[in-house]
Curated annotation (Swiss-Prot):
This is Conidial surface nicotinamide adenine dinucleotide glycohydrolase. Conidial surface nicotinamide adenine dinucleotide glycohydrolase that cleave NAD(+) and NADP(+) but not their reduced counterparts, NADH and NADPH. Lacks both ADP-ribosyl cyclase and base exchange activity and does not mediate synthesis of calcium messengers cADPR or NAADP. Its function is correlated with aerial hyphae formation and conidiogenesis, but its physiological role is still obscure. Is able to ADP-ribosylate itself for self-inactivation. It catalyses: NAD(+) + H2O = ADP-D-ribose + nicotinamide + H(+); NADP(+) + H2O = ADP-D-ribose 2'-phosphate + nicotinamide + H(+). Belongs to the fungal surface NADase family. Residues 20-137 are annotated as: Thump. The keyword Acetylation does not apply. Homodimer. Disruption phenotype: Does not affect the growth of aerial hyphae, conidiation or conidial germination. InterPro entries: Fungal_surface_NADase (IPR053024), TNT (IPR025331). NAD(+) binds at residues 151, 169. It comes from Neurospora crassa (strain ATCC 24698 / 74-OR23-1A / CBS 708.71 / DSM 1257 / FGSC 987). It is an enzyme of class 3 (hydrolase). GO terms for molecular function: NADP+ nucleosidase activity. Induction: Expression is up-regulated in mycelia grown in a zinc-deficient medium. Expression is strongly induced with the formation of aerial hyphae, accumulates in conidia and decreases very fast as the mature conidia germinate. Induced by the presence of proteins in the culture medium. Low concentrations of sucrose or glucose, Casamino acids or some amino acids such as methionine, cysteine, phenylalanine and tryptophan strongly repress the expression.
Length: 243
């Protein structure tokens, strides 16, 4: 497998954080789908409102779960997204979870109904590629004191610079399904001991533009914690002290 590291990517890989808003003026409620159109979505928007019976066509609609998940289908993510809840509010700002599609059309495009029975994840582990199809990535050492995060369990092996916008991560909406302990499935970590990762820009996928930075680890997050490389942190540590 070939890897390409362009000079422009070098600067990208050295980024270890994305600035959070310093005021409460960022958009809060994401309960209505946005008309935001990005590089991997079409220029159309779903013609139905969430109140329309047609909105949930093509989903595993479950009315008993409709207050928890969109259309009562856990694949589509939670109904309620952060509103005035730092640091997650700005991370999810302008996020259009279905990339302009109706829920059923989104599942038809991105979910493998007949094969794996799960999401069709991007090739090359989600890294962007050059014009010849080579992965744009390089080994990078995360230094002590760096903050990273992820939307997902500790058994995964991908991290991102802390507070990077969700739309830059090219993740499916189900990654936002959390619980009382970890709202919206959000986990923050600090680097305790330096360790190497494969770092590079993220390809557009799941109707999202991507182009953030991802760190693919050589052990899963749970192992990195157990071995003393990462420490779980309260997400509130990302909120500016004078906020």
């Amino acid at each position: 497998m070939k890897f390409t590291l362009l000079s422009t990517a070098v600067a990208l890989l050295t980024s270890t954080a994305v600035a959070l808003p310093t005021s409460s003026s960022s958009a809060g409620s994401l309960l209505n789908e946005r008309s935001y159109v990005n590089a991997s979505s079409t220029a159309t928007t779903c013609p139905y409102s969430r109140r329309s019976p047609a909105y949930c066509a093509g989903t595993a609609q479950n009315r008993t779960l409709s207050a928890t998940y969109i259309c009562g289908d856990s694949r589509l993510g939670p109904v309620v997204l952060p509103q005035f809840f730092l640091p997650l509010d700005p991370i999810l700002d302008i996020y259009d979870r279905f990339g302009g599609l109706c829920p059923g059309a989104f599942l038809e495009k991105w979910f493998n109904q007949t094969g794996s029975g799960w999401w069709d994840y991007p090739p090359q582990n989600g890294f962007s590629v050059d014009d010849e199809g080579n992965i744009i990535a390089a080994n990078l050492t995360l230094q002590t004191g760096t903050f990273v995060d992820r939307f997902g369990s500790e058994y995964g092996s991908f991290l991102a610079p802390a507070a990077a916008p969700y739309l830059q991560r090219s993740l499916p909406p189900s990654n936002l399904n959390g619980d009382a302990k970890f709202p919206w499935n959000y986990h923050v970590y600090s680097v305790i001991k330096p360790f190497a990762v494969l770092a590079g820009p993220i390809a557009p996928w799941f109707g999202q533009p991507g182009q953030g930075v991802q760190y693919q680890t050589y052990e899963n997050v749970a192992t990195l914690i157990a071995d003393g490389y990462l420490k779980a942190e309260d997400p509130q540590r990302l909120v500016p002290r004078n906020y």
